[in-house]
Amino acid sequence: MSVHPTQTLSLSQYLIEEQLKLPQATGDFTALMSHLVYAAKIVSREVRKAGLLENVLGSNETVNVQGETQMKLDEYADKVFNHTLTRSGHLCILGSEEHEETVSVPSGYKIGKYTIAIDPLDGSSNIDANVSIGTIFSVHLRKSPADTPGTLSDLLQKGSGQRAAGYVLYGSSTMLVLCTGKGVSGFTLDPSCGEFILSHPDMQMPETGGIYSINEGNYNYWSDEVKNYIRDIKSIEGGKKPQSGRYIGSLVADFHRNLLKGGIFLYPNDTKSTKYPNGKLRLLYEAAPMAFIAEQAGGMAVTVYGERILDLTPKELHERTTLVVGSKKEVEHFLKFAPKKP
């Protein structure tokens, strides 16, 4: 069997090669990513054994800071990433979906120059149904003085300033999609050697797509403008080919499919509940990293009002937003229907 050259390039080798291209590089980012990837491998191992082990599936019967029922794997993934990253020596502060406040580097450990905002296990409500889930992360350089404890302001930066962003998809295989501001690369975990291998170099999102991803169960709660858009892309008037609806309910899985196949993902605000008037997705560790990846792959990401996601400066750790992300021409078509911001 012939082997393509890229299929022998590990993530570690890839990061070192990229580091060598930058004369000012210190190796800190490469080391930080090594710790993050190690944690992802541990989580992947537990996800793959979820149906075989006790105390892995199901909920903890507790509610996290987001008001969501915390799944057992949620808590496990959170502990793994927190422990690994805060003790890496390259992080100054961590923001996690599972914690109301920021997570500091423990006493006795070196404080680094990077911040990470992370959703340790996105789509966790799908765990028991064996649906693909994922980890989403965003990396920034700190703004506060070096060697001092990181602050919340170090995390609250525009998405356009991200040093890196990515996600790990725990599906039929475990895949890491990484963007460091110079394109998007995909790595698949080879269980035989325990390494992420470059499997999808220079990933590009198709300019158009025939798939839309949205929870149509909330149709009656959307604005008229969003309803009109959905009716338009489903219309067969004039011989138009309607788009196909594909909604998994896991942001990582829905986004990943559209990254490969082309399409659009929408999470608008609605009137179903007064709890999330500005949308439900978190800006720092869901919308911003996905927007960074989408734009680097040739796509677009905006709010339901047409604001570029990467231009938004978060005002709080768990700030929420609407999200429309996907193929460039599909998002541009949505903008023709976008409501005006109140």
Curated annotation (Swiss-Prot):
GO terms for cellular component: cytosol. Pathway: Carbohydrate biosynthesis; gluconeogenesis. Gene3D superfamilies: 3.40.190.80, Fructose-1,6-Bisphosphatase, subunit A, domain 1. Pfam families: FBPase (PF00316), FBPase_C (PF18913). Mg(2+) 1 binds at E97, D119, L121. One of its GO terms (biological process) is gluconeogenesis. It is found in: Cytoplasm. The keyword Cytoplasm applies. Binds 2 magnesium ions per subunit. Substrate binds at D122, G123, S124, S125, N215, Y247, K280. One of its GO terms (molecular function) is fructose 1,6-bisphosphate 1-phosphatase activity. It is an enzyme of class 3 (hydrolase). InterPro entries: FBPase_C_dom, FBPase_class-1, FBPase_N, FBPtase, Fructose_bisphosphatase_AS. Mg(2+) 2 binds at D119, D122, E286. PROSITE patterns: FBPASE. It comes from the Bacteria. Keywords: Carbohydrate metabolism, Cytoplasm, Hydrolase, Magnesium, Metal-binding. The keyword Acetylation does not apply. It catalyses: beta-D-fructose 1,6-bisphosphate + H2O = beta-D-fructose 6-phosphate + phosphate. Its EC number is 3.1.3.11. Its cofactor is Mg(2+). HAMAP family: FBPase_class1. Belongs to the FBPase class 1 family. Homotetramer. This is Fructose-1,6-bisphosphatase class 1. The lineage of its organism: Bacteria, Pseudomonadati, Spirochaetota, Spirochaetia, Leptospirales.
